[in-house]
């Protein structure tokens, strides 16, 4: 068949299948902080299943484990990086303010 007759065929690209984020030996548990921390955003939110590439059952178990860890104070509910930064106290240079009438 001539190439001009089939202009919309795409060439087949080989692709490498991604490794699953949770291996078969990993235990989904609230004590397994190294595993849980991979599924939390920088702000402390639980990442969605589409982002994590987890199955429905795995996502449910991860969510439960994260919530248990938060309740038991292993994880913070909010991850505010502002609280860890040192805030410089600004000294008041002006004395008493005078009212302009």
Swiss-Prot record:
Keywords: Chloroplast, Plastid, Ribonucleoprotein, Ribosomal protein, RNA-binding, rRNA-binding
Subcellular location: Plastid, Chloroplast
Gene3D superfamilies for this protein: Ribosomal protein S18
InterPro entries given in the database record: Ribosomal_bS18 (IPR001648), Ribosomal_bS18_CS (IPR018275), Ribosomal_bS18_sf (IPR036870)
Primary location recorded for the protein, binned into one broad class: plastid
GO biological process terms, semicolon-separated: translation
GO molecular function: small ribosomal subunit rRNA binding; structural constituent of ribosome
Cellular component aspect of the GO annotation: chloroplast; mitochondrial small ribosomal subunit
Superkingdom of the source species: Eukaryota
Disulfide feature: none
Pfam families, sorted: Ribosomal_S18
Family membership: Belongs to the bacterial ribosomal protein bS18 family.
SUBUNIT field: Part of the 30S ribosomal subunit.
Annotated HAMAP family: Ribosomal_bS18 (MF_00270)
Official protein name in the record: Small ribosomal subunit protein bS18c
Gene: rps18
